[in-house]
Amino acid sequence: MRFKVSKLMAYILRHSPWEFGLEPDEEGFVSIEELVNAVRKVYPWVTEEYIREIVERDEKGRYEIRGNKIRARYGHSYPVILRHEEDKESKVLYHGTVRRNLKGIMREGIKPMKRQYVHLSINYEDAYNTGRRHGEDVVVLIIDAECLRNKGYKILKAGKKVRIVKHVPVDCISGIL
């Protein structure tokens, strides 16, 4: 059940807080109490402790609690100001997608589409699993992080295993697995 509640939290915090009567601040934070009340519209038994446990156990670090407020750390489809630490260490990152997207990617690079940032993974497995959400015929792109930095792109640490960047130019894609 934790998975379903976490998915609802991600939907609310990343895409549709207003649908649930929430007003995020410029960084995407909302009151934990208000989020609990919003989630209770679907899962009436949810408590603040349960929400905090989801945040604590989340392997990807999707959520952030600051004081009595909570937000999604990445994946927003509405404008938010993210002040994440820059990743200056990674040499290689990965992006999972489905084969049908390759032609466009190899022409225009990886674009954020309906989100603010392109999501990259620090390992192959997570990138592959991300790609699987979009179909069976998954390919994993190898991203040269140094190339991104040399072109002036900032790679941000959005979660424990997730990095975000505004765009990945074609020439920073160093391979396809």
From Swiss-Prot:
Top-level taxonomic group: Archaea
The keyword NAD is annotated on this UniProt entry: yes
GO process terms (BP): tRNA splicing, via endonucleolytic cleavage and ligation
Enzyme Commission code: 2.7.1.-
Stored SUPFAM superfamilies: ADP-ribosylation (SSF56399)
Molecular function per GO: NAD+ poly-ADP-ribosyltransferase activity; tRNA 2'-phosphotransferase activity
The keyword Cytoplasm appears for this protein: no
EC class: transferase
Gene3D superfamilies in UniProt: 3.20.170.30, RNA 2'-phosphotransferase, Tpt1/KptA family, N-terminal domain (1.10.10.970)
InterPro entries reported in the protein's UniProt record: Ptrans_KptA/Tpt1, RNA_2'-PTrans_C, RNA_2'-PTrans_KptA, RNA_2'-PTrans_N
Keywords of this entry: NAD, Transferase
UniProt similarity note: Belongs to the KptA/TPT1 family.
Protein function: Removes the 2'-phosphate from RNA via an intermediate in which the phosphate is ADP-ribosylated by NAD followed by a presumed transesterification to release the RNA and generate ADP-ribose 1''-2''-cyclic phosphate (APPR>P). May function as an ADP-ribosylase.
Protein name listed in UniProt: Probable RNA 2'-phosphotransferase
